[in-house]
Amino acid sequence: MAATQDYKPGDIPLEEQDDRRLFCKYHYKGVLIVVIPILLGPMFLGHPIMIYRFMYISLCLLLYYILNLMARGAVAFIYITFIPVLGIAGSKHVSISYYTDLIFLVYGSVMLGIMMDSSRLSERLAMRVIAFVGSSLKLLQIFLAISVIIMTALINPTIAAAIWMKVAQAVITEYDNAGVVKMNSEEKRYEVGSKPYPTRPVIGIYITCCYSATLAGCLSPFVNPNGVISSSFEGDLPIGKLLMIMAGPAILGIVVMIFWIQVLFLGLFGGSVKRDLAELDGNQNNFKATIAERKLALGPWTIYPILALILIIIACFLAATRKPIIYMGWDDLDNSIESGLSVPSIGMAILFFAIPANYYFCKYYVCRQPVKEGTANSLVSWKAVNNNTPWGEIFMLGAGFAAAFCSQASGLNAYVADSMKEHTGEGSGTFKFISGALYGTLLTMLSPATAVCRLSLPTLMKGGSTFSLPLATALHNQFLLPISTPSNTIIAGWGNIRPFQFMLAGSVIAIFMLIAIAGMTAIISFS
């Protein structure tokens, strides 16, 4: 943090270099920022005009984001400026689309995770995890996958990913301190003073948390987008039938995910990662002693982590019982007003700031001086929240919601639905089915599935069930970018994982899920 606070632009100049051939090494980002909009310029000649304008600005935003050409927080607001300028939608509606109910769920989940760190609850839970898995990264990955899957299926994927990501970070920190895993790479950072990039094994552990949450969400009758998809089809796709479609792909997807991440990030079949981990094997002998010392340093549980754990349990209970689809929840008591997940998550976050972390002040009320004097700080401070919230990634998630809104406002969804409706003749059913599966995967790559279901699915359903049903089930395929789902956003922000790394990790899983979901949809729905 000191490096971030002390650094000013110009303090650390670029390395001097006389070799003109290295121009691209130092300036390619600036060149691409200018070249990409120029190369995509011919799209303005396309028709319908508004659709091609939306596609143009979306491609520019996506390429800037994936190629890391500028700060993510700046890229996120491209829609706010250019969507009104291009005449697609007014600035008021675009701005509102950035701040949805799910964004505040993310804020609440982030504050919950930061409270875990402030109270050192994450460290205490990490010790319990280490006692079970030891120093094995592969066992840690499987343990985290199972834990996230259970919590997601019963509560919520975003909350589950946030909680277990903090535990995973605490475990990795202990591994790093013990010398059995190297946490941070030596790769040059995008900005001077910014967080270091994680090593490949660490990326694999972190990504396991969000991918497990996404896959478990496919199987749960308690969480969206399952509920929104089922209600959109008005009885033609009951929640039980939807879960039957998703059960096989999700279970097999978990196996594929664990295997692929172990191959790519944990050195299952050798490579540089396995060699790097082998070099640290010599520190295994001191691992148990180091962990034992850390347990002694933590000491017994105090009121601070106990309070944090109690509030987390209450938050999970409120989220799980809000609107669980298969039985009446507390939000169903008043059908005139919907209380989204932002209500319990932000409501509990307010308590994080209101409830004191210690009770020294109580003794003053009975005229007794406490043994250890001090102020009554809250469970989490705003400074900690401000410093540890991944603002740029959350703003990019807002851009994902805006993309779903703008695809509707530009007429893209209506155009696609009309095209599918008009496509008749021999083989049209197969074409529509494949197109629906591919288009659904594309939409959920750019926007969270729940937003697509609420904003785009009603229009796309006009293209017929042969198109809309595979599209709807394909919306569970949320692996390719941090903005694909809120759990991806949180893990990418806290773990400092870049978009291209998500695309690399999610490519095989996304292809498998595309084929598996489409296959099960065809077998169960059209047989």
What residues fall within each predicted segment?
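Interfacial loop-to-helix junctions that mark the boundaries of transmembrane helices
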Residues: 19-27, 45-53, 64-65, 69, ...
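Hydrophobic mid-bilayer segments of alpha-helices in multi-pass membrane transport proteins
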Residues: 26-39, 50-88, 101-111, 163, ...
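Interhelical loop segments of eukaryotic multi-pass membrane proteins
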Residues: 52-56, 77-78, 91-96, 101, ...
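Hydrophobic alpha-helical transmembrane segments
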Residues: 31-32, 55, 77, 103, ...
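Membrane-embedded alpha-helical segments and adjacent helix-loop junctions characteristic
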Residues: 15-20, 73-196, 376-379, 386-464
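Transmembrane helix-loop junctions in multi-pass membrane proteins
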Residues: 41-49, 87-92, 318-329, 358, ...
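Juxtamembrane and boundary regions of transmembrane helices in multi-pass small-molecule transporters
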Residues: 2-17, 22, 28-34, 38-42, ...
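Transmembrane alpha-helix interface/packing and boundary motifs in multi-pass membrane proteins
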Residues: 62-71, 147-157, 211-221, 353, ...
